[in-house]
A protein has these predicted regions:
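Glycine-aromatic micro-motifs
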Residues: 1-152
Length: 152
């Protein structure tokens, strides 16, 4: 049996169709809360859609979803999508609460490259259907093609 992980999501990955486009999988999810963190927006975004980031914020809690049992190939694709090699995001181990239980998980939090661009709030409702379609039909296929060229 392959090793799987849980991943806390709070932004574009809240949309199951975005996760499915990246990973080719549908995941069971739980509503979850990540303590001492807050979702923020960016003043500039490389995408046509508004992009969120997750920052540490003592005493605050961020609502999100917990993707359950994500396998290695999907994690590799999600890592690539979140550009952890570029410093845009960092992958960090966290503890989240869901259904009255604590879960160990990973999340993609703001990296050093995006710190200067934190600005305001971000809500899923800010992403239009057209922007979501652009991410799914244009951005993700290009990303997956680039990922394929990096596979040994």
């Amino acid at each position: 049996m392959q090793q799987t992980e849980h991943i806390f999501v709070y932004g574009l990955l809240l949309f199951p169709e975005v996760v499915a486009a990246i990973t080719g999988e549908q995941y069971q999810t739980l509503d979850a809360v990540l303590p001492d963190h807050l979702r923020r927006g960016l003043s500039q975004s490389p995408l046509s859609a508004p992009v969120p980031v997750l920052t540490e914020a003592a005493g605050r809690s961020q609502q999100g979803k917990l993707l359950l049992h994500v396998g290695p190939a999907a994690i590799r694709a999600l890592d690539f999508f979140e550009e952890i090699d570029s410093g845009h995001y960092v992958k960090k181990a966290v503890r989240v609460q869901a259904n009255g239980q604590w879960y160990s998980a990973f999340c993609y939090a703001i990296g050093p490259a995006l710190q200067p661009y934190i600005s305001g709030d971000w809500q899923p409702e800010q992403v239009s259907e057209a922007q979501k379609a652009h991410v799914i039909q244009q951005v993700i296929p290009q990303m997956l093609q680039a990922l394929d060229t990096t596979t040994p």
